[in-house]
Amino acid sequence: MEKLKNQECYDKNGNMLGWFSRSVAVAVFIFRKKEDKLQVLLEKRGKGAADNIGKYCSVCGYLDFNETLTDAAARESFEETGIKINTDKLKFLKINSDPSENRQNVTVHYVYFADETEDFNLSKAKGGEKDEVETVGWFNIATFKTEKELSVDIPKMYEMDFAFNHDKLIIEHLSKFFKLTY
């Protein structure tokens, strides 16, 4: 692998060896209502993660061969947090393909509203990369003023160091479902 021309890879004799393309990834923003609070499920990236070690993010990962996007969302959720999500409850949000924001991936974003009874159990998490996730937890990020209006606790969110702009994406995605006040 001596030389790259655009996404093509050539050896030193000019023979094309293959090409590089962007990967498809999923991001799953998991929320639940607990009493009068809205919580988000976040993971802290462990020492086995490819990048952004020690930073918080929502569930995210790559699409495997022979897998649908919703299958990838369910698999990544279980691998990284132990939560089994019902793919019928996944809500598609957007596709981020802007190379200036994310050169490596085309990311499909989903939101999932868990029931209070749905929980995670990291000890049940299977697969994934070794030590990819250090910890997983539910974090209070807003208080319900009404069923469709949230008072967002921005200072609490910004005490944490986020990977992949997930702090901004959490707010962006919530604004599609709730009126947000600060």
Regions found by a protein language model. Give the residues of each.
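Acidic, metal-coordinating catalytic segment for phosphate/diphosphate chemistry
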Residues: 1-36
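Short Gly/Pro-enriched turn/cap motifs at secondary-structure boundaries
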Residues: 16-20, 101, 128
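Short, solvent-exposed loop/turn segments that connect beta-strands within catalytic domains
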Residues: 33-39, 50-52, 87, 102-104
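Conserved Nudix-box catalytic region and its N-terminal flanking loop in Nudix hydrolases
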Residues: 37-79
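Nudix hydrolase/Nudix homology domain
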Residues: 53-54, 127-182
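A short coil-to-beta-strand element that immediately follows conserved catalytic motifs
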Residues: 84-94
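Active-site-adjacent beta-strand/loop module that shapes the phosphate/pyrophosphate-binding cleft
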Residues: 95-124, 137, 142-143
